[in-house]
Amino acid sequence: APNELKLIEWGVLNLVQSYTGNKKDDAEFLKSISPIQYLTPNYPPVLISGGNKDFLTRTQSLPFVKALKNQEIPVTEVFYPDSKEFLVHEYQFMMSKKASQQTFAKTIQFIQKYSPAFF
C-alpha cells in the first residue's frame, strides 16, 4: 500500500503540473486556485471529506476546514484519521468500505439539511 501512495502522489503532482505548466511547484499559482482565497460570508455550507491515506486531506482539506470555521461558514467534516481502512483519494466511491458507506449517509444528511427542495 505505501507504494500505491507514492504513485497517487506522483499522479496528483503531475496533474497540478499540467495545470500550472511548470515542472516545479508554483506556490503563488496554487494559492490563487485554492477556494480558501475566495471565502466570503455568503459562501454556501460545505461538506468536505478526505481519506486517511490521501495527502490532499492534510495539505488541502484540513486547511480548508480551518478557514471555513474561521469565517463561521457551516462545514460538515467527514474524515477518518484513525481508520484501519486504507482510504485513498476518492475512497467515497469504493462502496465496499464501511467509511464510504458512512460518508454516503452523511452526504445524504447534508443535502437534506441544506437542499431540502431535492427531497
Where in this protein do the model-derived segments appear?
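Alpha/beta-hydrolase superfamily serine-hydrolase fold, recognizing
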Residues: 1-119
